[in-house]
Amino acid sequence: EPAAAEAALKTCEEIDKLESDADRVMRSAMSKLFREEPDVREVIKLKAIYELLETITDKCEDVANLIEGIVLENS
């Protein structure tokens, strides 16, 4: 169905934009963390959390790319 395929592609594009935004936010947060957090233990904990969030957003983008490929292949 063309409308469903178009909607899926639009959603995939939005996910790609959101992942790029998340990358920028993560870089900024990481920079601020190293500049401003005096407690080394807190830096280590937050850095690990930020990296996990980055992994999650990357995986979401990977799924969107797979869906996009499937939609394009079948349209």
Q: For each predicted feature, which ranges?
A:
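Cytosolic, long alpha-helical scaffolding segments
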Residues: 1-75
